[in-house]
Amino acid sequence: MFDHPYLAMYQRLHEEFGLKVQLNLFYRMEDFDLSQVSEAYYDEWEANSDWLKLSFHSKLENVKPYESSDYDEVYEDCKRVHEQIKRFASSAALANTTTIHYCSLTEDGLKAMEDNRVFGLLGLFGSNQNPRTSYGIEESNAEKIRNGEI
């Protein structure tokens, strides 16, 4: 598995500096989906799961996929990716945090993530000069996040 240049780089950085990596996965891209991923590297994924994690990102790479999605859509898309990760890489390789594509979810989508045992959402909050907010967080709280207050 570490013959792949990106994974080899991550492994080298882990060995040299203790780097920990989380890869956020789309379920489908053009003519490929996660159900086609081989189980041949299962043992390697599991053996490296202390520093190399996989997580749900989105069903497809499209513009703001969950900005107005209901509970069922988000729940099923996340569940499908989680099932595939467990199949080809082990439960140990499944992260309990993620970054949703475009950092946007409805309240129902947030509940769907929690029900899929995702307990941390990583977002984009920008800087004080170029502020951003994620997951519908109020700007006042986003500012506190940027300043390290929460």
Regions found by a protein language model. Give the residues of each.
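Metal-dependent polysaccharide deacetylase catalytic core of the NodB/CE4 family, i.e.
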Residues: K20-D108, Q129-T133
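Active-site-adjacent pocket scaffolds in enzyme catalytic domains
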Residues: D31-F32, A92, Y102-I150
